[in-house]
Amino acid sequence: NLQRLDGPVRGNGKIIQELEGDFRGAGWNVIKLVWGGYWDPLLAADKEGILRKVMEDSVDGEYQAYKAHDGKFVRDYFFGKHPKLLEMVARMSDEDIWRLNRGGHDPHKVYAAFDSASKHVGRPTVILAKTIKGYGMGQVGQAKNPTHQQKKLDIDSIREFRDRFAIPIPDDQLEKVPYFKPAEDSPEMKYLHERRKALGGYLPRRRQKADEHLTVPKLDVFKAVLDPTAEGREISTTQSFVRVLNQILRDKEIGPRVVPILVDESRTFGMEGLFRQIGIYTPDGQKYTPVDKDQVMYYREAADGQLLQEGINEAGGMSSWIAAATSYSTNNRIMVPFYIYYSMFGFQRIGDLCWAAGDMLARGFLLGGTAGR
């Protein structure tokens, strides 16, 4: 909608074209939903491309202003940029010009864009839809910078809003600003219920506990780790954990549910043995022969690998951890993720995601490995 909280996002540029470049560069299919259907006759009449050029040359700060004023303002400051454009709209009233809509507010164009996106195969699709912040709020808030601070509308603005969107609430109830809910047997409600059932149920829905139960290994499985060494030699906590993890991975029930996650630090923690034991997950398998293939603990990638190797990407590692740690709720399938990171690169890089994980009731293990001394 061109606006952030304080002002336009790219007042001197064009955010849609900027985002288009980002997505196309990443290999996405991009659908731009910029102009509504009322522009179609004008674009069809634009034989010399003048209208298209003015559209392209106008920056977002100008587009915000057009929808914060009225039809006369648009006539003077948009179509007024070229005499032939003024000729083009000479027979249109200011109201007609004001009715020229943005693509994101045209139901037909929105449908066409979504239909095209749903039929596209081979690449993900993004729809960049142009809309107006505060759409329908009229002079109180439409396309205005303080729109997000607007806490309430006066009665005239509420009436204007009701009329604008044809909400069936009588005048004598407007002061209470009641919610409108269609009747249960209305086409709208029937459609909403049908869609929710087709999609697997109602939202929001939170599964507190998975329906399945996993048997925890008995303590004597970890005897080799818990018993003191014959020489009374101390071992590092990192080494102890690696031994515990190895035992858990061997368990027939819990083992397949374990998700070890590392961010380019496996060798740092002495965990490279897992490369050979469980493999590094990659959807397409290993398409090359690793340089250390002749070694016992070589870098083995596999389509059925279990270890997630995220590279130097703590945010990615934590995101994978959250996905596995909330699987009991979202997928009704318990997973046991272990995210092991270099201690000094831990919460410093993923603090916000830890907070989010707590809000989501994520269940798993975060381990700060070597302290870096």
Tell me the role of every PLM-derived stretch.
Residues 1, 31-33, 128-132, 136-140, ...:
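Generic beta-strand/beta-sheet core signal
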Residues 2-228:
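Long, well-ordered, tryptophan-enriched scaffold segments
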Residues 84-104, 108-112, 177-373:
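Thiamine diphosphate
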